[in-house]
């Protein structure tokens, strides 16, 4: 699904077996060939997608980044380090890039020793990082930082910092689909395309 936040209409609705980076590239290229001017892209941070459009500003949805952190650290983390990183991630939608990067740097300086703790497997003698989920959360933030505040660097484009507009459309569609559980696959796809055609406003 490719959706225009300015006109609030679906530009492309496709059924695909696998969501691939190449498919996204093809769809964006097809839109450009039709004369559609793509000022920016807001996406959920699918691996490999963020760096795929070098000539188009790409914003990663900040709410999706928060979800990634919560998935790694859970909603009720126990250690001070995980609690602090989760709390920091929750500020993403209301902070600036400079403030967030400074806070993340302070977090690392405070908890680097904990983050880098290693444990030894008594059977094999091999060591591994003790706090793997915390490292995954921290590395996710570091890896995605170049795209989390694109909206701030291009104020003239008024880029949304989340995909909430599209998520809201999906939510309404799913509610209607639940009322039509008996639809066959082909009918369901037509229903989805028709839904976005009628709800493009």
Located regions from the model:
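Hydrophobic positions within alpha-helical membrane elements
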Residues: 9, 49, 69, 172-173
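RNase H-like nuclease fold core
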Residues: 1-40, 47, 51, 55, ...
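Conserved beta-strand -> loop -> alpha-helix junction used to position metal-binding or nucleic-acid-contacting
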Residues: 40-86
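A short hydrophobic/aromatic micro-motif that marks alpha-helical segments and, especially, helix-coil
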Residues: 19, 79, 180-182
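Acidic/histidine-rich catalytic cores and adjacent linkers
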Residues: 33-47, 53, 86-201
């Amino acid at each position: 699904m490719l959706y225009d936040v300015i006109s609030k209409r679906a530009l492309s609705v496709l059924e695909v077996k696998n969501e691939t980076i190449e498919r996204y590239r093809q769809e964006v290229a097809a839109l450009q060939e039709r004369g559609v001017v793509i000022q920016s892209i807001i996406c959920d941070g699918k691996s490999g997608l963020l760096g795929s459009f070098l000539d188009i500003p790409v914003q990663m949805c900040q709410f999706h980044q928060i979800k990634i952190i919560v998935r790694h650290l859970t909603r009720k983390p126990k250690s001070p380090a995980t609690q602090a990183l989760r709390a920091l991630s929750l500020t993403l939608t209301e902070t600036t890039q400079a403030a967030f990067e400074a806070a993340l740097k302070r977090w690392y300086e405070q908890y680097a020793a904990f983050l880098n703790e290693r444990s030894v497997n008594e059977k094999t003698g091999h060591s591994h990082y003790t706090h793997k989920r915390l490292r995954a959360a921290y590395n996710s933030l570091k890896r995605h930082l170049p795209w989390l505040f694109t909206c701030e660097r291009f104020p003239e484009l008024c880029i949304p910092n989340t995909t909430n507009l599209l998520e809201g459309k999906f939510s309404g569609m799913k509610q209607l689909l639940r009322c039509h559980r008996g639809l066959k696959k082909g009918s369901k796809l037509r229903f989805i395309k028709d839904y976005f055609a009628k709800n493009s406003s």
